[in-house]
Amino acid sequence: MSKVLPSNLASALISFALLPSLQRLFPATATRPAAHLVGTPGSGKSEIASLLSSFYGEFSRDTPPAQWADTINTVETLGCPLADAIFWVDDYKSIYADERTFTRFLQAYSRGMGCGRLTRESKVRHEKPCRGLILSTGETTIEGEMSIIARMLVLEIPP
């Protein structure tokens, strides 16, 4: 494992990978963190994410469960059934989600809420909050309001 995980980040990465199994023991009022692995192409971000996700099932670097190119609604819905697992969302780029949309999603995620929506009849739709613990990868750092950055563990993966 030492050849895959950078030695200076290994303890943080493994701790984050095991956090979903302890998540139910935390009070409901605790905010839910997310981790973002940032690095250059070929630095091993997806390999690390698939390795950490493999604590919860079979994953490969080429088949992430979700991508930031998906709509935020899709990301939220795919993460809903993953209450006690890592939810790997690959390849963050600022062109995929504007800052306002991403900020709204991450704030709702950290509170365990869904992004509120209405039906065609203007009735409140049943929320499907993302319950998986988000492990994000990308070549750029996620930027936004300070409240978003405070909710994320941003780890730079060396080339």
Predicted regions and their residues:
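Conserved catalytic/switch belt of AAA+ P-loop NTPases
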Residues: 102-121
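Conserved catalytic network of the ASCE P-loop NTPase/AAA+ motor domain
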Residues: 78-81, 98, 125-130, 144-148
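AAA+/P-loop NTPase substrate/partner-engagement loops
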Residues: 43, 47-100
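Conserved P-loop NTPase catalytic core
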Residues: 143-159
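P-loop NTPase catalytic core of nucleic-acid-dependent motor ATPases
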Residues: 1-62
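Structural recognition of the conserved hydrophobic beta-strand(s) that form the central parallel beta-sheet
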Residues: 115-116, 129-139, 154-156
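Active-site-adjacent structural elements in folded domains
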Residues: 1-5, 63-75, 117-122
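Residues immediately C-terminal
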Residues: 94-95, 140-142
